[in-house]
Amino acid sequence: MAVNFPSIDPAQLHPVAGVTLGWAEANIRKPNRKDVLVVSVEEGATVSGVFTENRFCAAPVTVCREHLAKVRAGGAGIRALVVNTGNANAGTGEPGLAHARETCAELARLAGIAPGQVLPFSTGVILEPLPIERLKAGLPAALANRAAANWHDAAQAIMTTDTLPKAASRQVMIDGHTITLTGISKGAGMIKPNMATMLGFLAFDAKVAQPVLDALVKDVADRSFNCITIDGDTSTNDSFILIASGKASLPQIASTDSPAYAALREAVTSVAQALAQLIVRDGEGATKFITVTVEGGKSAAECRQIAYAIGHSPLVKTAFYASDPNLGRILAAIGYAGVADLDVGKIDLYLDDVLVAKAGGRNPAYLEEDGQRVMKQSEIAVRVLLGRGDAQATIWTCDLSHDYVSINADYRS
């Protein structure tokens, strides 16, 4: 079940000028469910993305990279995105690449744009051929359904093992101009940094130069979707896309050194973090949402390395599920994180406000009932103080329950 998942009111998902979304039921894997999404962006928008680091990347990821490379080389801008659920089109070889390109070509034909102006995305079962004819047959309905206010339907259309649609929206003022940001995400399992079995699409109406948007998407991903983990697996299809429609009155942001860029980065990061945290809250079988913060490191990289050792540990995660304050498991994870010169004699460990370990050993004042009180909460903060510098890092994770096994054992049935 989802952990303290916020209620999402479709009416509070602000339309983004220059962006429309439409969906269809194409029976990609199961009948009577939204499983195709088309996102159209008006001419003049800029689009950028980051993708999985899994070497066995899916066919649509390869095609997305190709099309964005052509844009960066001066080609025509991206005008549409197409997403299917139920089938990952991964591990499908040359036929899979042909299907991804055929999807782009068909949507381009219907929309009156070039195939290279389409980005394809797939999510679902790996190693099965994409039912391309069903997907193509669903495109006209998705195009006909397009509307600026369809963000909630769009969030439903990209779900797989998700139990709830994930969306976030906000409006901010930058240099006296209103900027609207709205995004959707999906993902519930195989969540690990770089990036997760996740798709994330975030649009805003600021006008941003292509090189600046390329920098922004990497920066934002590193502060959001690369800070979550559920089971430590990295997917073949991870994709995070930013769309800058350019319809707001704010002058174009052409430099990463400008105050406007800093303000936009803060706003985009806040929405992306909300979308990333929704994925963890809806993690497969999750019953607890856990924030792991490591402070006092020599670098943010080593802090994140230790945080992920804690967040990935099945022993730590099952202890949280059982509300068992077997917190030595956290110390063990810190120790095997791979920070070679770590002085464990300087480490303090907190569970919420409870000091569990001090100077590398059990705090004499620590009572197990205090630890168990925190472990029974649905939201828990783990804080590690390394005592070797000023850097810090935070990740978000969840516990590991019996339901996680059941969901994944039954996924293809």
UniProtKB/Swiss-Prot annotation:
Primary localization class, coarse: cytoplasm
E.C. number: 2.3.1.35, 2.3.1.1
Top EC category: transferase
Chemical reaction(s) catalysed: N(2)-acetyl-L-ornithine + L-glutamate = N-acetyl-L-glutamate + L-ornithine; L-glutamate + acetyl-CoA = N-acetyl-L-glutamate + CoA + H(+)
GO cellular component entries: cytoplasm
A biological-process GO annotation: ornithine biosynthetic process
Pathway(s) annotated for this protein in UniProt: Amino-acid biosynthesis; L-arginine biosynthesis; L-ornithine and N-acetyl-L-glutamate from L-glutamate and N(2)-acetyl-L-ornithine (cyclic): step 1/1; Amino-acid biosynthesis; L-arginine biosynthesis; N(2)-acetyl-L-ornithine from L-glutamate: step 1/4
This protein's record includes keyword Amino-acid biosynthesis: yes
Described purpose of this protein according to its UniProt entry: Catalyzes two activities which are involved in the cyclic version of arginine biosynthesis: the synthesis of N-acetylglutamate from glutamate and acetyl-CoA as the acetyl donor, and of ornithine by transacetylation between N(2)-acetylornithine and glutamate.
Keywords tagged on the record: Acyltransferase, Amino-acid biosynthesis, Arginine biosynthesis, Autocatalytic cleavage, Cytoplasm, Multifunctional enzyme, Transferase
Site entry (Cleavage), positions: 196-197
Binding site for substrate: 160, 186, 197, 284, 408, 413
Site (Involved in the stabilization of negative charge on the oxyanion by the formation of the oxyanion hole): 123-124
Record-given protein name: Arginine biosynthesis bifunctional protein ArgJ
Native organism: Burkholderia mallei (strain ATCC 23344)
Subunit structure: Heterotetramer of two alpha and two beta chains.
Taxon lineage: Bacteria, Pseudomonadati, Pseudomonadota, Betaproteobacteria, Burkholderiales
InterPro entries according to UniProt: Arg_biosynth_ArgJ, ArgJ-like_dom_sf, ArgJ_beta_C
Family per similarity comment: Belongs to the ArgJ family.
Transferase keyword on record: yes
Annotated catalytic residues: 197
Cellular compartment(s): Cytoplasm
GO molecular-function term, one example from the UniProt record: L-glutamate N-acetyltransferase activity
